[in-house]
Amino acid sequence: LGREFDVFIPLNLERKEHARLFDYDIDDTVRQVFLLARRPMDRSKRTLLFIDEIQNSPNAVALLRYFYEDYPWIHVIAAGSLLLTLLEQHISFPVGRVQYMRLNPCSFADFLQATGNGLLREEVENLSVNAALHDMTMRLFSEFALVGGMPEAVARYAENRDIVALHDVYDTLLRSYSEDVEKYAKTETMKNVIRLLLKSGWTYSTEQITLGNFAESNYKAREMGEALRTLERTYLLELTYPITTYVLPAIQEHRRKPKLFWLDAGLVNYAANIQQEVMFSDNIMDTWRGKLAEQLVAQELLSGKTDADTHRDFWV
């Protein structure tokens, strides 16, 4: 995205020197941002400012409205893995000045584009894949089912087509999620429950789960539910409750068991230790008792959906 702008300035507010830029008023902040980037302030240049981990600076959140009002020529994207937890800290985003969007894993169409199959992507999106291209399309879909859609994993796979080389990508992601427990767990018990989820919860992907004693643990439904909802606010997973009615409005039954969907099939494959089964499967629909196919369908349902409140349903 940055390549589409004349000027691209990335900031990461986990770095103290970047976070300190927002300790001043909007004019001083903008001036220092450009000085740090060693770029002149030029209103004629299309400029993108990318602020990562914005949850680390309430001041940066507050200044977003002034970028909108006083510096409309600077396009601002703010990202963070824990944005919804800011609401619990009574840190509010400027009303009417910020558009909320969720960032999803790459879709199959994105995977095709990244791996040099852009023309085939058009055929797939237009539902016009003919018999001659069917086998190649299914082979690529099998690769996508194995790799998943995490951007770094897709980019690395596009370079070398080596699934083993992706292990450090998945490892790093899983380790970072585990390390982030300290940021969003309120109590020691919640830390332990979340660690259990991040260690053992992947094998329950797409299953209807019972919260009490989940994953053969001794944790109560209240403790497990609180931990799951905390991870849900980070978009790492989603609890999807069933719909039982035949008529509109379709309302989820929260008294019934929810299904657990994780962020990405590639992470599930790695964390649940089923990569080998996926790699040598002749039929994705049968792989892992059909659970992988359901995870992939759930992901594709979200592709292209950027509304932060979008959720999936299932019917029983």
Question: Which residues does each predicted region cover?
Answer:
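Short glycine-rich substrate-engagement loop in P-loop NTPases that contacts/grips substrate
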Residues: 11-45
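Sensor-1/coupling segment of RecA-like P-loop NTPase cores
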Residues: 70-91
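Conserved P-loop NTPase "ATPase switch" module shared by AAA+ and STAND
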Residues: 41-60
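P-loop NTPase Walker A phosphate-binding motif
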Residues: 1-7
